[in-house]
Amino acid sequence: MDPGVGNALGEGPPAPRPRRRRSLRRLLNRFLLALGSRSRSGDSPPRPPAQPSPYDGDGEGGFACAPGPAPASAGSPGPDRPPGSQPQISSGDGARPPGAQGLKNHGNTCFMNAVVQCLSNTDLLAEFLALGRYRAAPGRAEVTEQLAALVRALWTREYTPQLSAEFKNAVSKYGSQFQGNSQHDALEFLLWLLDRVHEDLEGSAHGLVSEQLPPEVSKISEDLRPSAAPTSLGPSFVQSHFQAQYRSSLTCPHCLKQSNTFDPFLCVSLPIPLRQTRFLSVTLVFPSKSQRFLRVGLAVPILSTVAALRKMVAEEGGVPAEEVILVELYPNGFQRSFFDEEDLNTIAEGDNVYAFQVPPSPGLGTLSAHPSGLSVSPRLPVRDSQRFSGPLHSENRVVFLFCNLVGSGQQASRFGPPFLIREDRTISWAQLQQCILSKVRCLMRSEVSAQDLGTLFSIRVVGLSLACSYLSPKDNRPLCHWAVDRALHLRRPGGPPHVKLAVEWDSSVTERLFGSLQEERVQDADSVWRQQQAHQQPSCTLDECFQSYTKEEQLAQDDAWKCPHCQVLQQGVVKLSLWTLPDILIIHLKRFCQVGERRNKLSTLVKFPLSGLNMAPHVARRSTNSKAGPGPWSSWKQPICLPTTYPLDFLYDLYAVCNHHGSLQGGHYTAYCRNSLDGQWYSYDDSTVEALREDEVNTRGAYILFYQKRNSIPPWSASSSMRGSTSSSLSDHWLMRLGSLNNSTRGSLLSWSSAPCPSMARVPDSPVFTNGVCHQDKGGVETRPLVRGVGGRSISMKASPASRSRHGPFKTMPLRWSFGHREKRPGASVELVEYLESRRRPRSTSQSIVPLLTRAAGGEETSASPRSDGTLPAKSEDSGRAIGQGTTGVPLSSCHLNHHPALGSLDDSLHTARTRTGNVSQDIRLPKKFDLPLTVMPSVGDEKPARPEGQKMTPWKGSSQVGSQSSPPSPSTGLLRNFKDSGPGTLPKMKSKAAMEERAPDKDRGQGTFTLLKSVFWKKEHKRTVRTESSPPAPPISLGSDRLSPAAMNEQALRIRESPAKGLGNHMERDIRSAPSSLHLPRKASRPPRASTAGTSQRTIPGEQISYGTLQRVKYHTLSLGRKKSLPESSF
C-alpha cells in the first residue's frame, strides 16, 4: 500500500519512521568517519567539520554536487567512491586540459585561490603532492594533506567546492590570521603555506617516501645533491626546491675588509624603480573676462603632500602660496577642498583641480586683470610685513567660492565659470543677490535687466546635509547662518579660510536670463604636453629591478658600523647578492610602498621575460675554490661555480604569475599559469578559467612571479618542449601514474590527449640519438647544449625496489630527455660502435643481446653466406691489451683486400655501400626505436670451405647446433698454433686460455657469435698459411707489448700490399661473390670515409710482422655485448 494512502486512511506505519531510519544511518556514518579520522591522526585533536559557508551556492562556480566525504589523504588510499558520487566532467572542460580548473570563492578567498593555482601548476610540487610522495609525521600534516587532495582533484577533474572549503578550514585552524572572510595579502599566505608544508614534512629525509635511487643515478648526483643540515635528517621538499641563500656583504671604505652574512630566502622581494615625480594638471582661475581658465602641467613628487602642490601652483602663477585655494570641481559642482597635511596621492591624475587666488585686503595690493603668461603682474611693490599685517579673514569679511548650477541637489549641472568674492557676513539677501548677478552679468542676455527680478535662485552650503544647508532669503543676514559657521570651523591648515556655495538656478529662469549656455573651453599651456610626454606610462625591466636590489648603498652617518679591523666607526658599503639559486624562483614585486603614514600602490609596468631569464649577472661572483658561508646553510646547498661553466644552472622559465588588481585599501587577485600538458597559458579568476595569449601575460598588476630552473623542468612537462628539448605524450605525464584514476577519467584524459598538439612529440627511448656524439677530451669539460641534470629527472620515474630486485643492481631507467636541440634536424644514423666511442659505457647484463636484436629485426630473412672480410676496427692504444684479455672483436686490416686481383670488385662494392645507405638487400636495419642500424652477421651453416692439405680439424663442442659436420678450430686453438714459437712463456698462457674456453658451458656462448668466429678464424688461418710460405723471416715480437714499432708496421704494410696471394685466387673469389660485406656499416653524412677501416691484430708466427693502419679506438660489434667477459674501462 502506498504510505501516503495508508496515512490518509489511518492505517499502515506512521510517516516519521523512514525519516528516523535515515537519521540513524547518517549518525552511524558520522561516527564511523570520526572514528576512522581519529585512528589515522593518532593523538592529534579531531578536525572540526567544514562549516557551511554562506557563499556556497550553485550560482557561482558552476558546481551542483552535493557535499561528499572528505578526500583521501595524500599517500594513503581513501575509501572507494560510490559510482554515483563521482562528479561528471562538464562539456565545457573538454576543450581545456586537466589542471585548468577553477576554484570557488568562499568569501574574499581570491588570494588563496590564486596562490593554490600557481602552486598547482608548479610541476615538481604538483607531482610530489598528487602522487603522495611524502612522508609526514602523524597528525601534523593536515594542511599538506588537504593541499595535496585539492591539487589532485584539480588535475583529475574531481574538484568540488567542499574540497576548497576544507582546505580553508585547515588553514584557519593552524593560521589564526586567516580566520574569517577578511582580505589578506597573497604573498603573506604563500610564505605561510610553504612554511607550513616545510614544518609538516620536517624530520623526514627530503620529505619523500623512503626510496633508494638507482646506483648510477646516485653516483652521478652525489656531488649535485645538497648535503643535509647537521641538525636534521635532511632538507625538506620546500628547502630542496624553493629555498636558497643570499649574501649580505659589508665593506669597510678604509681598509676594504669585507664582512659577509648568509641568510636563506624563499622569495626575492625586488623594489620597483620609482619615478620621483608624476604628472598632474591644475586649472588656474583668473578674474579677467578675456582669459578665465588656463590648465598647467606639473611634475609633482610621488611621496609628498598637498602643501608641495600648493607651492608649485603659487610659483607657476607668481603669487604667494598662502593666497592659493585648491578645490575639486566637477560638472555637478564643488566636491572638496585640499589642505596641506593631506597626502598628494589622494589626488588622481584625472581629477579636476582648480586653483583660486584670494585677492589681498584693500590697500595691500591688487591683482592685474591682464596676466602675462602664467604670472599675475604687476602688483604693488609692498613689503611682506605690510602685506600680511592684517589677516585675510576676519569675523565680518569671509571668502566665498561660488559656482552656478542648473537644477538642485545631485542632479544639478554646472554652467559658467566659478568665481570668488570677499563679502561681509552682515549683508542682506538682496545685496548678496546683486553681488552674484554682477559676477555673471557677462553671461546674461543684453536685453535682460537685472533690476526688480525677485528671488532668482537658491544658495546652498557645500559639504553639509542638503536638508539643513540652504540659506533662507527671508533672513536679514543670510550669511550668518549656522551652516556657514560650521563650514568655517571645519577648516584645516592650508590656504585662506573659505566657504563653498552652490547657486542653484531654475531651468526656466536660466533659459530666460542666459539662453543656451555652452561649456567654456579650457586652454592648455605648453607645460601640459611637455609633462605628459615626460611622464608616459612608466615601465621598467626585471633586470633593472634586480640591479636596484643588488646595488651598493652606503650607510648613513647615524648608522655607522664599527669595523672589526680598523676598530673605528665607518660608513660601510652594503651590497646584497644571491649566493645560491633554487629550483623554483619566486620573485615578489614591491608594488605597495609606505612612507610614514602614507601608502601607495605602484602601477609601473615591469617587463619580465617568459623564458630564458638569465640569473648569472645577479649571482655573487666567486672562484671555484671559494668556500660557502658559515653556518648550517652552507653545508645544505653548495655554491655553484662560475656562471660561464654551467649556463643552464642560471636560466629560468616563467610558468605562473599572481596578479593584484585594485588599490592598497582593497583589490582582487587572479593567476596566470602555463599548463604542463599543452603548454598554453590560462587565466584563473576564482571559478572562471579562460585561455590567454602570451602577449597578455605581462600586465601592470603582476605581483608574484614563479620561475622554474630550466634544467629542473621534468621531461614530461610541456614547458620542457617549449625550451628546446623533446616532450612526451600524456602517457609519460605523472597524471597517468596516479593510482586513483578510474577507467572513465583515464579514458577522458587519453581522448583529450588525442587532439593535435604541436608540443607533444615522442621521446626516444634509447640514450643514443641521431645527432652527433659529443666527444670529451681528457681534462676538458664536455659541452652538451640543453642537457638536463639529475634534478630534472621526474621523481616518479625512479625504479621501485621490486623492479630493482627483478632486474638486478645495474638496471637503468630509460632516459626521457633529448641531448639535442628540438629544432635541430636529425642527421644520419650512427652505429653502436660510435656510441661506445663516446665513453658512455653500457652496464653489463646477464642476458644476451642477440635474441633482442633478432626480435627487433622484425622477422627479416638474412642470408646464410659467410663473410670473407668480416672485420671490426682496432683501437689505437689498447688493442694488444684488449686482445690479450679476451675481447670478442677480431680485427682485420682493410688492406688485406688487395691480396688478390680478383678483389677489385670489392672496392667498388664498398664505395657503393658508402654512398647508398638504404641498401636493404645487404644491410638489415633495426627498427627506429633502437636507433642503432647494424648489420646482422649471417650464419655459415651451409658453407663447406676447402681445407688445405695436412691441416686437421679440431672438434668443436656444440658444433651440432650449427648444422655443419665439420667446423673450424676454436679461436684459442688457432692462436696456440700461430704463437707456438713466440717464446717460452707464451705457449703455457695460451694453452691455459684454450683449456678454459673449451671447458666453458655451452649456454654462455651465443650461437650467432661463434658462427661468426668459426668462419672468420678459418679464413684467417687459411690466409696466414699462404702468407707465411712467401714472406721472409722477421725479428720476433713480444705479445706483452701493446704497440709495435713504426718501422715494423710500415714494413709489414708494404709487404702485405705487394704479396699476390696466388694460392687463394679461386677460393677467395668464390667467397666474395657469395658473402655480403660486413663493412657496409652506415656512416654519418658529415664524416668523410676513412682511409683504412682499422688496424690488423692477427696472430702470426714469430717470423711475421703485424701491420697497423691508422691508430683508432676499437669499435665493438653488437653481437659481442652478450658475452660475460668484462671489457677494460680504458678500451672505451
UniProtKB/Swiss-Prot annotation:
The modification Phosphoserine is found at S970. CDD domains: Peptidase_C19R (cd02674). It comes from Mus musculus (Mouse). Keywords: Hydrolase, Methylation, Phosphoprotein, Protease, Thiol protease, Ubl conjugation pathway. This is Ubiquitin carboxyl-terminal hydrolase 43. PANTHER family: UBIQUITIN CARBOXYL-TERMINAL HYDROLASE, UBIQUITIN CARBOXYL-TERMINAL HYDROLASE 43. Residues 101-710 form the USP domain. It comes from the Eukaryota.
